[in-house]
Amino acid sequence: MPQLVLASTSSYRRALLEKLQLPFITDAPETDETPHAGESTEALVQRLASAKAQALAGRYPQHLIIGSDQVCVIDGKITGKPLQYSTAVKQLQQASGQCVTFYTGLTLLNTANNSINCTCETFDVYFRTLSQAEIDGYLLREQPWNCAGSFKSEGLGITLFERLAGRDPNTLIGLPLIALTQMLIEQGVNPLTVKPVE
């Protein structure tokens, strides 16, 4: 089996990939994440996921490299990680009572034969109408400063939602495992037939 490389230092993506019980390493890609003029959200996340995988290709010439990138769209605008309390408050105020869409680009690059597979998975989060006290209470408890959209769905963030809609809930956390599994199987790596990590 070719060695898997996760082109990310995200602890969230690492934890998701561990669910597949395959051996892998992580490495930090250096990529310019500036959107191109007129670029659609889907094209942006696919381009960045691909760029992250390709940024590591020279270091890993006989590997399967996984690249992923995610953006959150609130009210038609791309929203990033809040990084601070005041920005998180604004993001949750904007999301209150709205549908927020997450776009996650996924790339699997086989550097042994130079084949590449890219896709974009979307996931919709329907927020309850939130009071300012709820927003403040949530942010003080969970402090999701490094999470697009200012919440952690795998934690207390679930209390902010009315409903969720999408093919794979892992997409919301940053790595679509259903799509990734399909890509891996196409490359001859089936998580159910490979010896699991001890």
Swiss-Prot record:
It comes from the Bacteria. It is found in: Cytoplasm. Its cofactor is a divalent metal cation. GO terms for biological process: nucleotide metabolic process. Its EC number is 3.6.1.-. Coiled coil: none annotated. Gene3D superfamilies: 3.90.950.10. Keywords: Cytoplasm, Hydrolase, Nucleotide metabolism. InterPro entries: ITPase-like_fam, Maf-like. It holds the Pfam family Maf. The keyword Cytoplasm applies. Its main location: cytoplasm. It catalyses: N(7)-methyl-GTP + H2O = N(7)-methyl-GMP + diphosphate + H(+). One of its GO terms (molecular function) is nucleoside triphosphate diphosphatase activity. Nucleoside triphosphate pyrophosphatase that hydrolyzes 7-methyl-GTP (m(7)GTP). May have a dual role in cell division arrest and in preventing the incorporation of modified nucleotides into cellular nucleic acids. Belongs to the Maf family. YceF subfamily. This is 7-methyl-GTP pyrophosphatase. It comes from Yersinia pestis.
